[in-house]
Amino acid sequence: MEPIEQQLTELRTTLRHHEYLYHVMDAPEIPDAEYDRLMRELRELEAQRPDLITPDSPTQRVGAAPLTAFNQIRHEVPMLSLDNVFDEESFLAFNKRVQDRLKSTENVIWCCELKLDGLAVSILYENGVLVSAATRGDGTTGEDITSNVRTIRAIPLKLHGDNIPARLEVRGEVFLPQAGFEKINEDARRTGGKVFANPRNAAAGSLRQLDPRITAKRPLTFFCYGVGILEGGELPDTHLGRLLQFKAWGLPVSDRVTLCDSPQAVLDFYHNVEKDRPTLGFDIDGVVIKVNSLALQELLGFVARAPRWAVAFKFPAQEQMTFVRDVEFQVGRTGAITPVARLEPVQVAGVLVSNATLHNADEIERLGLRIGDKVVIRRAGDVIPQVVNVVLSERPEETRPIVFPTHCPVCGSDVERVEGEAVTRCTGGLICGAQRKESLKHFVSRRAMDVDGMGDKIIDQLVEREYVHTPADLFRLTAGKLTGLDRMGPKSAQNVVNALEKSKTTTFARFLYALGIREVGEATAAGLAAYFGTLEALQAATIDELQKVPDVGIVVATHVFNFFAEESNRDVIGQLLAEGVHWPAPVVINVQEIDSPFAGKTVVLTGSLSQMSRDDAKARLVALGAKVAGSVSKKTDLVIAGEAAGSKLAKAQELGITVIDEAEMIRLLGA
């Protein structure tokens, strides 16, 4: 695997993790600014290598899937997200793209609004009566929060006025004003309840209560900013006109909505709002800029995940200066040793920050950082922000160099740094307590074996008390042994045992992912499972055979081969199977028996599809015997090019590979 492929894999894994925490668990670990930075970095890398873009990349989708605790509502009109810009130059480039697409030299009229920092919702009115409400979810399917939305006093249960459409779906943001947030946390501290990190978390947690009576006690409010379904009625032909109409029908709309007739007017609006931000009484993280004319919006259209006629102009992350008092080293699941700066505590964006990630030795060298230095930190996460730079002009006299350990700080094993990699790793494997903990946490995680109720603190105790050394030991736990753990009663212990038993029935792909093989994420695990079909076949595969799997190169193939060549790993797998871990036998697709032009072909999808999602297209192609790869090579038989196909299309043409468009694909799928 090339270094850029490794970067892409790590970035996508990190972004998916934070999408899940943000959209599903309502417990984000990082602020939007850091998420945006990660997404921006991923987009920039993918722009350098479009042939490495995969259908499941976070850049190709809107958000994360919803929980199943609520009923689900499918959005008849998808709730898309907005693309972001972060500086004046990027906004001016966006403005120029819009003008170029419209083939106009005249200034566009922009409607500018606040970008609220809450939870996006859709509310459906039929004949003026509120009938349902849903979260955005993944943009296609959200959670039914009707009962909770009905408790928000700002949202009318019935619209008033004339010419109300038969069906009207409004979109907007539910949020918690600063005063309400402070009161909730004050009450929580007094009663020993949950204290929220910020108003957005509090709003999301309040809105997604299973008991609407709890939601009703929270001072949530709402601003409307758009429309989804519109049937049996008409709306004005400008965005501002629609907002004013919503307001006339009784829907709350922000009073900070302004028409701007030039790019400079937009920039003035942005800076004025940024200046007023501390006095608004509620959290925002930027401004939203939309083409005011609905006719022009229609002309501009959409890209895969966002409209071309709107953009979010985000505020910069907040920064502060403080001192590095020490540097400690943490060990992760794969043995990666990460330096963490211990800081003189400082308030950043309302959070007391005392730690900052330093990533790796290269980053420390790049910063020129020493213990004792004065540094600028940016709040890149609620837990561990990042050091942006060293204030060299104010370097104290008594600073010390940061020395990377030559032995693991946890188990004492040697450490190694593979040439070409930035990461230093402990070589101790499962004899290292830190790696053991993180490996087990990964094994039981939701996307791996999905052991409900077995959280990080339980794993920590199990390892520290030496109850568990390998994943197989988890399935030997009894309720009696678990009851001895902190805060674990008999009922909770039995629930964990039941969850472990339930998790024994899994899939081959999940099992492979749970093993924690280096560089094998969910997508690669699924590819390996689909290609080899059985564990026995995979274990017997050579490095050359492994590279025949779509998107598996020499680096990943070597990691997989070495993992199964290690006797201790084979022993653990044998123990897991002996404890009853199993999955359904593979459904073998005989491509010779499939009457389809795609059977046995290696196919690459590129560009955006309008008739179906890439995931749906991929599923249908696989069902017809195709192998769907993420990049074009000499092995590729066919490229399906959607709108705005890029370098994959160019490479296919260069290699003389057959190319078809979406319409031809759909025709062949039905053949």
Curated annotation (Swiss-Prot):
Keywords: DNA damage, DNA repair, DNA replication, Ligase, Magnesium, Manganese, Metal-binding, NAD, Zinc. InterPro entries: BRCT_dom (IPR001357), BRCT_dom_sf (IPR036420), DisA/LigA_HHH (IPR041663), DNA_ligase (IPR001679), DNA_ligase_AS (IPR018239), DNA_ligase_CS (IPR033136), DNAligase_adenylation (IPR013839), DNAligase_N (IPR013840). Residues 593-671 form the BRCT domain. GO terms for biological process: DNA repair; DNA replication. Zn(2+) binds at C408, C411, C426, C432. One of its GO terms (molecular function) is metal ion binding. Its EC number is 6.5.1.2. Belongs to the NAD-dependent DNA ligase family. LigA subfamily. PANTHER family: CHROMOSOME TRANSMISSION FIDELITY FACTOR 18 (PTHR23389), DNA LIGASE (PTHR23389:SF9). This is DNA ligase.
